[in-house]
Amino acid sequence: MGTTVTAKDVQVLRQRTGAGMMDCKKALEETGGDIEKAVEYLRKKGIAKAEKRADRAASEGAIVALVSDDAKTAALVEVNSETDFVARNEEFRALAQAVATQVFGDAGFDGVVTVAQEGELLKQPWHKAPGKTVADAVKEASGKTGENVVLRRYARFKSDGVIGSYVHHNGRVAVLVDIAGGDSPAIKELAYAVAQHIAAGVPKVPLGIVREDVPTAIVERERGIYEEQARNSGKPENILAKIVDGQVNKFYEDNTLLDQKWVRDDTKSIRQLVADAGKEAGAALTVRRFARFQMGEE
């Protein structure tokens, strides 16, 4: 018995790949209805372009970034609600701000927790009300709003260099970036510029800072797709390896921060931007890490 393909699955696949309706239907039939495998199937056939990266959950809420005056400590928090109506509510926004303050003040924590329920924050005493936990404060917000309010994720960076932050004007994307090697005003400006670039997600949201940061499994998956596309292109066998190597190199250029072209000036890479700033400051600068939160993103 063949796989039953629903119109909803076809629509999801079309949105993710830009492929036609019948191509999407066939891809789902060939892959047993598995959307991820169908995306790969379409790409191998050359029907779909590289998937538009954006995990499109429809969550609303608030993202808050806090940075100390000396730019050495920062916090980033995402709190979700079900509707934009609640997300714009003053009490909800005050909750998000207060959670960010709680994270900022947690001197024992440094890093990123991508699933808040797996971290320690929700268990901590709530700094605004002794006797309650952070989880209690979030539950109270749910009760007041009538919506499922969720602390989604959070980050706290402590740096001996500088931390730059950028929050997009719509409040749906925010970034922290930690740069080591100095803390002059020029380096703070660099940190802001790099954070702004990461927020823009152009050409892609970086998978890592350098090529070695990109998981091998992702690179091998892409290489496999490029190899099949090359074989299907009808081009001479003796040039296929060179074509594939070029595509893999382009993948790295698009997906690693230091290789990316700067969003403000595409004649310069982020690596060059950092090197130029270091030369001006008389310091060897390193982008140590970053955190990027986009509203509702998986």
Feature map (PLM): residue ranges:
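N-terminal assembly/interaction segments in proteins that build large macromolecular machines
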Residues: 2-298
